[in-house]
Amino acid sequence: MSSIDNDSDVDLTEDLAVAKIVKENPVARKMVRYILSRGESQNSIITRNKLQSVIHEAAREENIAKPSFSKMFMDINAILYNVYGFELQGLPSKNNMNAGGNGSNSNTNKSMPEPLGHRAQKFILLNNVPHSKNFDDFKILQSAHTYEELIVTGEYIGDDIASGTSNTLESKLSTDRDLVYKGVLSVILCIVFFSKNNILHQELIKFLETFGIPSDGSKIAILNITIEDLIKSLEKREYIVRLEEKSDTDGEVISYRIGRRTQAELGLESLEKLVQEIMGLEKEQTKSLHDDIIKSIGDSYSI
């Protein structure tokens, strides 16, 4: 039997197993709908207590005994991964994320442990659908083209109801706000990464000014939010971690590090691809890229 036949048999076995779960575990079905809905609307971290509460409520509605969390976690992920291409991943303790912060490379090569699975206290929904560069490029080009059409005499008219909705980014695979948000987020994360995972608040703001992001309290165009409020939002979503220290000379000193969500969503390999794209490097030019990045990002992927 060929390896292709073996792979087909494995896929069929997995499909049958997932179909059995979908059929026999109504609580898992409801949990998957809840998790996907929450991920779509809030893009937030989900606590273990919240998941247990929803599981308990779903079990009560189905008039069945409350199942174990570990079994539910396994069945939920089986459906998420095999049907939708997602994974519910446990996050490491937040206390570990606050350790360090001196910008040294002492922990750079300390790899992150295996995912905590059902034992974690907080979880994040990850998209495991294989990356398609051509499709992503198409979305970006389409979004950028549509955005340009919303600039009239130097003014953005996307928020003007009178302009209609037939040609908005939302109707063309993306939204203008989403495009800007992801762009600013990428800039902020790269600044923190390549400041060896330790940057002062004032330094971050200065860097962002060079990208045209206002620091005078005025709102960022399209996002309609100040940079201070955006940073607070990124803290809340745990893309970055805020550290506060008391100094006899400078008073309160605020700095930032990479957060758990970024570690989970943007792994080292993804960061390498991002740098490769930004720098326009061909494959043969990336031989030393991994080592160069490791030297530059401090303990960003340590815990």
UniProtKB/Swiss-Prot annotation:
<dbReference type="GO" id="GO:0032204">
    <property type="term" value="P:regulation of telomere maintenance"/>
</dbReference>
<dbReference type="Pfam" id="PF01454">
    <property type="entry name" value="MAGE"/>
</dbReference>
<comment type="function">
    <text>Acts in a DNA repair pathway for removal of UV-induced DNA damage that is distinct from classical nucleotide excision repair and in repair of ionizing radiation damage. Functions in homologous recombination repair of DNA double strand breaks and in recovery of stalled replication forks.</text>
</comment>
<dbReference type="GO" id="GO:0000781">
    <property type="term" value="C:chromosome, telomeric region"/>
</dbReference>
<keyword id="KW-0233">DNA recombination</keyword>
<dbReference type="InterPro" id="IPR041899">
    <property type="entry name" value="MAGE_WH2"/>
</dbReference>
<dbReference type="GO" id="GO:0030915">
    <property type="term" value="C:Smc5-Smc6 complex"/>
</dbReference>
<dbReference type="InterPro" id="IPR002190">
    <property type="entry name" value="MHD_dom"/>
</dbReference>
<keyword id="KW-0539">Nucleus</keyword>
<dbReference type="GO" id="GO:0005634">
    <property type="term" value="C:nucleus"/>
</dbReference>
<protein>
    <recommendedName>
        <fullName>Non-structural maintenance of chromosome element 3</fullName>
    </recommendedName>
</protein>
<dbReference type="GO" id="GO:0000724">
    <property type="term" value="P:double-strand break repair via homologous recombination"/>
</dbReference>
<keyword id="KW-0234">DNA repair</keyword>
<comment type="subunit">
    <text>Component of the Smc5-Smc6 complex which consists of KRE29, MMS21, NSE1, NSE3, NSE4, NSE5, SMC5 and SMC6. Interacts with NSE4. Interacts with NSE1.</text>
</comment>
<dbReference type="InterPro" id="IPR041898">
    <property type="entry name" value="MAGE_WH1"/>
</dbReference>
<dbReference type="GO" id="GO:0006281">
    <property type="term" value="P:DNA repair"/>
</dbReference>
<keyword id="KW-0963">Cytoplasm</keyword>
<keyword id="KW-0227">DNA damage</keyword>
<dbReference type="GO" id="GO:0005737">
    <property type="term" value="C:cytoplasm"/>
</dbReference>
<dbReference type="InterPro" id="IPR037445">
    <property type="entry name" value="MAGE"/>
</dbReference>
<dbReference type="GO" id="GO:0140588">
    <property type="term" value="P:chromatin looping"/>
</dbReference>
